[in-house]
Amino acid sequence: DDSFVVKALGTGNCENIIFKNSVLWNDFARPMEVGVELRADKVRNIKFENIDIIHSDTGYPLMGIHHGDHAEVSDIVFDNIRIEDTPGAQLFDIRIADSVWNRDNKMGDIRNITFSNIKYLGTDNNDILLSNSRIEGYSEKHNIRNVNFQNININGKYALTPKEPGRNVYEF
């Protein structure tokens, strides 16, 4: 299943978690994930740092935050991530949506997400790696805010800014 995953199945907070200095080979689901089950009051201060994804052939997002419960999700950092063999994958996927794993009848929100120093070194997949990546809130009230991208490098080219506001199509 997911290689590194943060879930919050009970009450209280889920916070101050660091995954670092690791090499991931992923055969099913996502290499790095926060969610889907996020039933705590707060899920915050989660960091994925200095990680190599050397294989993930699932087509799933490489870095994901999937939320469908009531938690306030904030301050999630993906930093110094190197990616190699990942055919068909999305670079990231951040969503608030209903799912079969949700137990709450109230949605939360997602705030302050940082992707920095991400380097993709694969031989294919360039066309969908970013274009299929998405940021998708649930409603105006339950939304995603303050997502930052710094130094995103795809095979030697830096992703700059969205080509069109509101779309996940990036130019190099």
PLM-predicted stretches and their roles:
Residues 1-8, 15, 24-34, 52-63, ...:
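Short glycine/acidic-rich loop motifs that flank beta-strands on beta-rich extracellular proteins
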Residues 10-20, 36-53, 67-83, 99-122, ...:
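Surface-exposed loop/turn motifs in large extracellular/passenger domains
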Residues 162-172:
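C-terminal effector modules
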